[in-house]
């Protein structure tokens, strides 16, 4: 069994609470969302970085067992053209759980009246169990 850990400190919530139907209706897969309270976003799993959007608002990682994870950084942040993100990872990088992926300027995102919530989605497998509310720390399942 693979364990998906939180990529950021904050408050865990159900995907149904995300104000974007792609996530709340689980069109991309199941998972959780975290309302972040720090600017460092870390890998939730060990695996390989498979995708980083040009605008740096989303990162994909595949585990060694083939689980595809999508980390979407904020809602509608694609419109910011990468400005609030200092991405440290590159496509093809091997990452361990807890490795730094990107640093996010949440204040800039909030100042643009955008939601800072971070959906973490398993796109190709069923999710059996997850924390769906309350405080969560980097590395906690």
Give the residues covered by each predicted segment.
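Contiguous, well-folded functional domains in the mature portion of proteins
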Residues: 1-141
